[in-house]
Amino acid sequence: MAKPAARPRKKIKKTVVDGIAHIHASFNNTIVTITDRQGNALSWATSGGSGFRGSRKSTPFAAQVAAERAGQAALEYGLKNLDVNVKGPGPGRESAVRALNGCGYKIASITDVTPIPHNGCRPPKKRRV
């Protein structure tokens, strides 16, 4: 028996004033996620998803483009103020924060939340080029 056609649900438009921007800057890519205070994702973007491939993904310009895309997508929720959490040692840390500032957000705080091991896992071996 065929299922009855489900009516499309109306997307509830919520307005959020304060949010958190999580910037994960690794050596290979930069991921920017903008959430509300509870941690529910409003928008996200990556350097790879913004059209950069290979070694160009890990550039500061690619991180800037990813942050601009995530910031513009989150503007439709009425977001005004951002706290920024930066994680990782990648090259796109500062440029992503500057791009969010350029989108018109008022940045209240910038916090470095990079996990630091207390002598945990063994690090990868050093590169010999």
Curated annotation (Swiss-Prot):
Per the record, GO CC terms? ribonucleoprotein complex; ribosome
Record's subunit section: Part of the 30S ribosomal subunit. Interacts with proteins S7 and S18. Binds to IF-3.
Question: Which Pfam families is this protein grouped with?
Answer: Ribosomal_S11 (PF00411)
Question: Cell inner membrane: is it a keyword of this entry?
Answer: no
Which organism is this protein's natural source? Pseudomonas fluorescens (strain ATCC BAA-477 / NRRL B-23932 / Pf-5)
Output the Gene3D superfamilies linked to this UniProt entry.
Ribosomal protein S11 (3.30.420.80)
Q: What is this protein called?
A: Small ribosomal subunit protein uS11
Q: Offer one example of a GO biological process linked to this entry.
A: translation
What is the similarity comment for this entry?
Belongs to the universal ribosomal protein uS11 family.
Give the taxonomic lineage as stored in the record.
Bacteria, Pseudomonadati, Pseudomonadota, Gammaproteobacteria, Pseudomonadales
Cite the GO molecular-function annotations of the record: rRNA binding; structural constituent of ribosome
InterPro entries in the record, alphabetically? Ribosomal_uS11, Ribosomal_uS11_bac-type, Ribosomal_uS11_CS, Ribosomal_uS11_sf
Q: What does this protein do?
A: Located on the platform of the 30S subunit, it bridges several disparate RNA helices of the 16S rRNA. Forms part of the Shine-Dalgarno cleft in the 70S ribosome.
Task: List UniProt keywords, sorted A-Z.
Answer: Ribonucleoprotein, Ribosomal protein, RNA-binding, rRNA-binding
Acetylation as UniProt keyword: no
SUPFAM superfamilies from the entry? Translational machinery components
Q: Which gene encodes it?
A: rpsK
